[in-house]
């Protein structure tokens, strides 16, 4: 299902449903479509679901870092929602959620992390990006998932176009470096809000030990595993993911 993107002066975002505000933050390589199932599910369960388009490629080069993106999300919540929200962040979106929770705790009622960066993650490494090699990009995209068929041709084409756009390629590398540099380990014990950690057991990008460490260092956190699942649980095992998260929020 294609959702209508609202285009305001400062923000482009999807907004579906009424009720408790839920803000979904996408990752570096993931667009809004990664959250299709979540938007459908939660917008019908008494939630007001927002998916802002993060300005990953729109920032000046010198400001292309996670702190700037976290400030953007804070502004979005302040101006479009105006009250504390539940943040759900996947991959880099989780990292942005962690930064936001530690810098603007007044805006975050609950934090949900899935395949979140912030401690460490495996990146494309020194070989990124091998631009012209579509097979390589296909293989790397498939590695994100437990089930490689989720890496559809459409998704591979998106990633391929991204790494072949020189400016976007540079900014992708800068954000990946910013994620590695901005390690959150010392900040985790200071997080006061409830945190739900939902992780794919077969996540190759942010391996399971990241989830175990986050659970260990974040005081008020719960950890849930999804089996036969990689780095984007809400996309790969949507029913299970939505069920776990819905129950968790209901109990808070």
Can you name each region flagged by the protein language model?
Residues 229-238, 242:
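Catalytic histidine-centered segment of alpha/beta-hydrolase-like enzymes
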């Amino acid at each position: 299902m294609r959702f209508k993107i609202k285009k305001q002066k400062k923000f482009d975002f999807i907004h579906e449903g009424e009720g408790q505000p839920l803000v979904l933050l996408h990752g570096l390589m993931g667009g809004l479509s990664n959250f299709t199932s979540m938007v459908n599910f939660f917008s019908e369960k008494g939630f007001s679901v927002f998916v802002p388009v993060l300005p990953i490629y729109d920032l000046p080069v010198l400001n292309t870092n996670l702190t700037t993106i976290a400030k953007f999300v804070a502004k979005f919540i302040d101006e479009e929602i105006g009250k504390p929200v539940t943040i759900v962040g996947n991959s880099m979106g989780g990292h942005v959620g962690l930064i936001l929770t530690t810098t603007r705790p007044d805006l975050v009622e609950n934090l949900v992390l899935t395949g979140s960066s912030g401690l460490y993650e495996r990146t494309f490494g020194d070989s990124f990006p091998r631009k012209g090699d579509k097979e390589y990009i296909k293989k790397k995209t498939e590695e994100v998932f437990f089930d490689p068929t989720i890496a559809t041709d459409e998704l591979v084409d998106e990633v391929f176009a991204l790494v072949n756009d020189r400016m976007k390629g540079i900014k992708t590398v800068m954000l990946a470096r910013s994620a590695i540099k901005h390690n959150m380990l010392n900040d985790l014990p200071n997080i006061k809000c409830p945190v739900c950690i939902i992780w794919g057991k077969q996540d190759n990008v942010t391996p399971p030990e990241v989830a175990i460490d986050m659970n260990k260092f974040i005081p008020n956190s719960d950890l849930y595993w999804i089996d036969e699942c990689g780095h984007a649980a809400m996309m790969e095992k949507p029913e299970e993911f939505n069920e776990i998260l819905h129950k968790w929020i209901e109990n808070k």
